[in-house]
From Swiss-Prot:
GO terms of molecular function: phosphatidylinositol 3-kinase inhibitor activity; phosphatidylinositol 3-kinase regulator activity
Annotated protein name in UniProt: WD repeat-containing protein 91
Pfam family, one: CTLH_Armc9
One Gene Ontology biological process: early endosome to late endosome transport
Main location: membrane
GO cellular component, one term: cytosol
Residues with PTM Phosphoserine: S256, S288, S293
Superkingdom in the source lineage: Eukaryota
Membrane-spanning intervals of the chain: none
Keyword Flavoprotein: no
Compositionally skewed regions (Low complexity) per UniProt: 265-279
This protein's UniProt keywords: Coiled coil, Endosome, Membrane, Phosphoprotein, Repeat, WD repeat
Length: 747
């Protein structure tokens, strides 16, 4: 509690200084300096009592204890009255013992003279009035205990503990509860981190156990079947290579005088005709029939007459229990075929790179395997470069995905507020929904605008307020808790489209982008733009407005000519503003000087979305040309990286239906968002959000996670990291909003 009081005092000082209340600040400092409660510091209160005893100031000691009784002890229940009385008695005895030990009998006599009226009727003091007159009170059995060092230390510790418990149990004002909240938050974060590590450890253990279960089965299959090299590598051998392997094996067989039973049974369909020697001649019908009955069931389309063994070798092999061996062999070959097909369907590279543990006699070639690629559920890239099906560690775990379905038309904007607790969504019909998702998904406010709405932004300081930009030249301030419009201001009648709104992080102002009617929709502002290059090349203005007075402060200069600004974004402290325009130019404004610091042509066509990077040394932009580009803001026009994105990530977005129905929507909301550390980016796609890894050296963005869940193209995204778990929002053209909760893996 003492630490919380001290920090609160500092915050109050800072606030008074910020507001210019210097007289109040001086008065506060004076009262804090004379504070008898010492900021609820127990050690300072005990030190104050000891200092008063050391200077023999009995009156001040009595007054200070009376103040503590009146200010602190009076709040306790009656059952603690005996404890307080015992502490007071021990304090006065401690004072008397100190006067005797320092040979100040006059102070001891003064104590009894001033306290006699109060103490003479108390039984515990009747023996103490003779204390000043005893020659050696420390040897007296009645007082010897109080002169020991142990008793003095015990009293100080008891007083300290009593005050500590008292301060912990005291009701505190709301402003001091933040310390306990911080401690609880830190504790929850630590518990979350422990659970996170346990979760990833369990995942790794499950993966290891699965791998251990698969490995013995694969090894057993290889040991049992003893496949020769040309069978295990059949999937990557051509005809010429296969003929060479067969010829090599023919040479090895001619050198070996011993022929096994299994080799005599295996069909010879893959042998070259050159293997038949003139002395062998054609096979006997009986041997052909035997080969059909025992070996022909495993593989279809075999030629029983090609390359058969002589009758003597075959009959010597069939002499031992041919029926039992044939069934056992057929069962093993079928199991082997199933296992190879399963391995090939799981990962082709794993089976292709395996080497057989032993090369046995000739075996029946497996039938041709048709492998189907495993559709990735979350990862876009599956097996690693070495094969083996071992996936790289996923950066996120999807804890859950929920759907908000109260919109019935295409979403334009979907934004989480600063606290990460509420979401504001806007569709093309002018329906605004404010809803929460923690602990349950619930609509808090709903409103329908008579005029078309084009832009939406949360206020930063009062996060209950929404800024709504319309298509008729007005900006509305909407209170989400009172569920009403606080005010509506007219921006410009000649430039009715409010394309973008951005509120400064300090909450004092916001910027507003107003533009003339688009060339494709001069009358109906709700009609979607077709996204052709040059269709939005209309005049525009960028204005700065005061949030409190709702009055225009200034108009920014847009060089070389006024143009429609599509997107705006502030940096963390509001000193910089970046904008993307319909002419493909990115402009960086200094908000302290209120002027354009630099500008450069970034895209062919319009700039759809622009954001600052995590370290704010660069900005990212997505344009009509389908490029995702990173720019250095310290050098105008310096390109750090450039990537090409799919058309369903950049727009215009197209939703097709039956009978030639086709809906086209140009990007309005945010097209990409970053995680808390700026290492990953969430973008739109035709079936859901896609998360890419940033900062790599590759020329192509690495797709890490596909969120999915949508049946219509996703048109805007947002990523909130205010909570411990990240929350990804993806909104689509069918009015559905998916809320995906992610747990980030921390190394």
């Amino acid at each position: 509690m003492a630490e919380a009081v001290e920090r609160t005092d500092e915050l109050v000082r800072e606030y008074l200084l910020f507001r210019g209340f210097t007289h109040t600040l001086r008065q506060l400092d004076a009262e804090i300096k004379a504070d008898k409660e010492k900021g609820f510091r127990v050690d300072k209160i005990v030190d104050q009592l000891q200092q008063l005893m050391q200077v023999y100031d009995l009156a001040a000691l009595r007054d200070y204890w009376s103040y503590l009784e009146r200010r602190l002890f009076s709040r306790l229940e009656d059952i603690y009255r005996p404890t307080i009385h015992k502490l007071k008695t021990s304090l006065f005895r401690f004072y008397l013992v100190y006067t005797i030990q320092t040979n100040r009998n006059d102070k001891a006599q003064e104590f009894f003279a001033k306290q006699a009226t109060e103490l003479q009727n108390q039984a515990e003091w009747k023996d103490w009035f003779v204390l000043p007159f005893l020659p050696s009170p420390d040897t007296n059995p009645t007082f010897a205990t109080y002169f020991s060092r142990q008793w003095a230390d015990t009293f100080i510790v008891s007083l300290h503990n009593f005050l500590s418990v008292l301060f912990q149990c005291m009701p505190v004002p709301v402003i001091l509860n933040f310390d306990a909240e911080c401690q609880r938050t830190n504790q929850v974060q630590e518990e979350n981190e422990v659970l996170r590590q346990k979760l990833f450890a369990l995942q790794a253990e499950i993966h290891r156990l699965k791998k251990e279960e698969q490995q013995p089965e694969e090894e057993e299959a290889l040991v049992q079947h003893k496949l020769p090299p040309y069978v295990s590598n059949m999937d990557r051998l051509g005809d010429s290579e296969l003929a060479m392997v067969c010829s090599q094996r023919n040479a090895s067989l001619s050198q070996s005088p011993r022929v096994g039973f299994l080799s005599s049974l295996l069909p010879q369909s893959k042998k070259s005709p050159s293997r038949l020697s003139p002395a062998q001649g054609p096979p006997q019908p009986q041997s052909s029939a035997k080969k059909e009955s025992f070996g022909g069931q495993g593989t279809k389309g075999k030629d029983p007459t090609s390359g058969a063994k002589d009758g003597k070798s075959l009959l010597s092999g069939l002499a031992t229990g041919e029926s039992g061996w044939s069934q056992h062999r057929q069962r093993r070959l079928q199991d082997h075929g199933k296992e190879r097909k399963e391995l090939f369907s799981t990962t082709t590279s794993q089976c292709a790179e395996k080497k057989p543990e032993a090369s046995g006699p000739e075996a029946e070639p497996c039938p041709e395997l048709h492998t189907e690629p495993v559709e990735p559920l979350t990862r876009a890239s599956s097996a690693g470069p070495e094969g083996g099906g071992v996936r790289p560690e996923q950066p996120f775990i999807v804890l859950g995905q929920e759907e908000y379905g109260e919109h019935h038309s295409s979403i334009m904007h979907c934004r989480v507020d600063c606290s990460g607790r509420r979401v504001a969504s806007l569709d093309v019909d002018g329906v605004i929904k404010v809803w929460s998702f923690n602990p349950i998904m619930q609509t808090k406010a709903s409103s329908i605008s008579k005029s078309p709405l084009l832009s939406l932004e949360w206020a930063t300081k009062r996060d209950r307020l929404l800024l709504l930009g319309s298509g008729v030249g007005t900006v509305r301030l909407y209170d989400t808790e009172a569920k009403k419009n606080l005010c509506e201001i007219n921006i410009n009648d000649n430039m009715p489209r409010i394309l973008s709104l951005a509120c400064s992080p300090n909450g004092a102002s916001f910027v507003c982008s107003a533009a003339a009617p688009s060339l494709t929709s001069q009358v109906d502002f709700s009609a979607p733009d077709i996204g052709s290059k040059g269709m939005n090349q209309v005049p525009g203005r960028l204005l700065l407005w005061d949030t409190k007075t709702m009055k225009q402060q200034l108009q920014f200069s847009l060089d070389p000519e006024p143009i429609a600004i599509n997107c705006t974004a502030f940096n963390h402290n509001g000193n910089l503003l970046v904008t993307g325009a319909a002419d493909g130019v990115i402009r960086l404004f200094d908000m302290q000087q209120h002027e354009c610091a630099m500008s450069w042509r970034a895209h062919y066509g319009e700039v759809y979305s622009v954001e600052f990077s995590y370290d704010e040394n660069t900005v990212y932009s997505i344009g009509e040309d389908g490029k995702f580009i990173q720019w250095n803001i310290h050098k105008s026009g310096l390109k750090v990286s450039e990537y090409s994105l799919p058309s369903d990530a950049t727009g215009p977005f197209v939703l097709s239906g039956y009978s030639g129905y086709k809906q086209v929507q140009v990007p309005r909301g945010r097209l990409f968002a970053f995680d808390s550390e700026g290492n990953y980016m969430l973008t739109c796609s035709a079936t859901g959000g896609v998360i890419y890894k940033l900062g790599g050296d590759e020329k192509v963005l690495e797709s890490c996670l596909s969120l999915g869940g949508h049946r219509a193209p996703v048109v805007t995204v947002d990523w909130s990291t205010a909570m411990d778990c990240g929350t990804c929002l993806t909104a689509s053209m069918d009015g559905k909003i998916k809320l995906t909760t992610l747990l980030a893996h921390k190394a």
